[in-house]
Amino acid sequence: MVVALKPIYDAVGIKRINVATYQAVSGTGKEAIEELASQTAKLLSGQDIVCEVYPKQIAFNVLPHIDTFQDNGYTREEMKMIWETRKIFGDPAIQVNPTCVRVPVFFGHS
């Protein structure tokens, strides 16, 4: 994101960034990939599912929950986006409003 926005920031400035990321389960690891596959197969077969990796069903669902929630309501992943943007832009005042969502895709963030 910052690679695309930095030239704009340098040319005319940016005061606020609203951004959403849609991240595949592979970002959580092998167990998450297996959980998505298992839940998908079971739901399509009319069976009950088990949630072990994620706190809620991931198959046919989206979870606005990547990493742990912080006291300010953002997740750690969202806070990393804020911190990194401010650091790279050299602007501690820039407002960044990220939403990071886990989606039921095996590989490839959107």
Predicted regions and their residues:
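Active-site-lining helix/loop region of Rossmann-like oxidoreductase modules
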Residues: M1-S110
